[in-house]
Amino acid sequence: MSRRRAHDTEDESFDHRRNKRRRVSENQEIEDRLESLILRVGERSTSSVESNLEGLVSVLEADLGTFRLKILRILSDCAVRMPEKCTVYTTLVGLLNAKNYKFGGEFVDHMVKTFKESLKLCRWDAARYSLRFLADLVNCHVISATSLLQLLDTMIDVSNEDTVPQVRRDWFVFAVLSTLPWVGRDLYEKKESALESLLLRIEVYLNKRSKKHHNALRVWSSDAPHPQEEYLDCLWAQIRKLRQDNWAEKHIPRPYLVFDSILCEALQHNLPQITPPPHHASFEYPMPWVVYRMFDYTDCPDGPNLPGAHSIERFLIEEHLHHIIETHHHERKDCAAQLLNFPFKHKIPLEYCIVEVIFAELFHMPTPRYLDICYGSILIELCKLQPGTLPQVLAQATEILFMRIDSMNTSCFDRFVNWFSYHLSNFKFTWSWDEWDSCLLLDAEHPRPKFIQEVLQKCLRLSYHQRITEMMPTTYAKLIPAPPVPNYKYTNEEAANLPGITVALQLVGAIRQKCTPEEVVNILKEIPNTGYSGEEMSDGSFNALKIDVFVQTLLNLGSKSFSHSFAAISKFHAVFRALAETEEAQICILHNIFELWSSHQQMMVVLIDKLLKLQIVDCSAVATWIFSKEMTGEFTKMYLWEILHLTIKKMNKHVIKLNTELSEAKEKLSKADSSSSDTDEDTPHKRKKPITHADKPSEEVVERMEEKLEAANVNQKRLFLIVFQRFIMILSEHLLRSDTDGRDPDTDWYRWTIGRLQQVFLMHHEQVQKYSSTLETLLFTSDLDSHILEVFQQFVALRA
């Protein structure tokens, strides 16, 4: 009997577990179905958005009892992750609130929590979308207009904070302004005086804020034909225009208007008092930007009109397109399809809007959000999907950019070159070059011939020399790059008179016979330590002739391809290290690479990158070489600055890596210590598994890591000091010489050079920012010429 009872109990237990698993599985299926329904609501289907919403409300209302928390989480996630469907979800919440007031209150609390958490964690876009959602709930009678205005007023209070960065104050004002298109009409009808008071406070702030950063972020220095407006100024002008139109905009879909009779009967909730978290030194705020304008209504005569620069519709359309790129940029085909499937495409000249927004992203200062090639690949997919219209709009945009290139920012010039050469390579290098031949009459340093020259250099990297020669009209002969072949001086006609010729020929034979690095060292010992003049050098000096013979001979033998060159450098790495003991010796190596490969810019870039990776040359040596007198003729060419930026990036990555490793080691050490103390305090039955000695770094290891990081920071600071000091020297010399000779200093060379200085500041702003006080004390002092000093002051203003 007892056995039977035990057997029955086991069966009951098994049935209970099986039923529990079934219930869990069924619940998971229902949750997944609910999530799918909520995510897809309002998307294209056979029924209307309103019908979709009514059906979904019925489903959710029935499941609120069981899946309340899940529904709250999904809806609040949608509010942040799918801002383009904001009004669809606010309508859904409004209808649920009308049927279940308690759920409406819970959702508002949940949304407020999301908003506060986003502010605390510096998730600025998520915070702005949360605020927009809360504001739109006023239109759905979920939240009272009075409590929303209190929140907006509290956010504008931040604009009066003292001793905080302007970028913090700017963001809170921007968040409020960008919310008003959704809720402005309702606030105007219900609380007009309070709304006007809010706008007055915003205007007072905007009138007194500094815009020192503005010129550094402009794509063009000229405002003709389109003004390059600072983002807050532009949005303020758009909001003022909206106010003049009595807050009536024509872009935002408002499905809740259909349900007004239901929603207006619902009880409203008041937002709690929300205080923005105080500023902390670790907080990073979005940097300011300049609104990019390329087209106006005269550029797109056919079809619907392009909204004016100060219409709120222009802001809303651009923001939506930027969000599509942000969401889908990882997959270029999906991104292009989503852009062309823009919901309001029949109301606007969509191709013009898309092209303008993509170039706005590409030319965004200080740096684009994504790699240049991301935007190029999306434009190619757009041309494939819309072959009848988009290539023509893109050609029109290219023409506009080329005609305005005289006043284009140097960083944007580089990006334009990179994009156009890549685009040409995907369309058989076809272009109507004859239309641009007027640039051939201009000085070689003028941006237009310079642009074509740099484009052809980039095309050479993506093709081959004969192809470039064939594709260009004969009139462009002077701009076509020289054939990319090595200039090995020990085989020239005058080679017999060169001091190192005998050893060079001996070295060629030995390397071809696959000699060892030791044998190369022995051969090089035959070269005495003399300069090129033949005079005996002191023992402490590097042997320039030895470096000359070795570097030029080895790299000439490896000139067949990048791989051959890399293999040669790797095999004789020890010889390079022995020869490159001092910075002067390293500069000599770079000089010989340039002498050998002066007609092959890409080879120079990849070889110097390789030498940096193998630590044969230091970053400071590369910087010093770039500013040396022998490189004067190359100074305005793009490849030289490509080398400088990859050098700085190499140093920056090294510092960041050491910083990360040190932080992780300190964290492990801290956790190990706390784990050890916790283990001592725990009871034997609840003892935690301690962190092993293998996982825990010793204090000595951490100290060594700190020393390494400190040394890296010193080297990084030295690199920036070298770069900026050289810029100041050559620019000051130019300005002084121009003043003495009574010439206009504003030459093409000067504009390129000041542009490159600005580019270094902006491209590496996160790392340079650490040393801004040092730079101000040592280099960018008040007695410096105002033209140079202004570049530094604009940079500092970006984070001020």
Curated annotation (Swiss-Prot):
Q: Where found, per UniProt?
A: Nucleus
Record-given protein name: Nuclear cap-binding protein subunit 1
**What organism is this sequence from?**
Drosophila mojavensis (Fruit fly)
* SUPFAM superfamilies recorded: ARM repeat
**What does the function comment of this entry state?**
Component of the cap-binding complex (CBC), which binds cotranscriptionally to the 5'-cap of pre-mRNAs and is involved in various processes such as pre-mRNA splicing and RNA-mediated gene silencing (RNAi). The CBC complex is involved in miRNA-mediated RNA interference via its interaction with Ars2 and is required for primary microRNAs (miRNAs) processing. Also involved in innate immunity via the short interfering RNAs (siRNAs) processing machinery by restricting the viral RNA production.
GO molecular function terms here? mRNA binding; RNA cap binding
Q: Which UniProt keywords apply?
A: mRNA capping, mRNA processing, mRNA splicing, Nucleus, Phosphoprotein, RNA-mediated gene silencing
- Main localization category: nucleus
Q: Boundaries of each MIF4G domain copy?
A: 31-243
Q: Which GO terms describe its biological process?
A: 7-methylguanosine mRNA capping; mRNA export from nucleus; negative regulation of viral genome replication; nuclear-transcribed mRNA catabolic process, nonsense-mediated decay; primary miRNA processing; regulatory ncRNA-mediated post-transcriptional gene silencing; RNA splicing; siRNA processing
- Domain of life according to the entry: Eukaryota
- Modification type Phosphothreonine: residues: T9
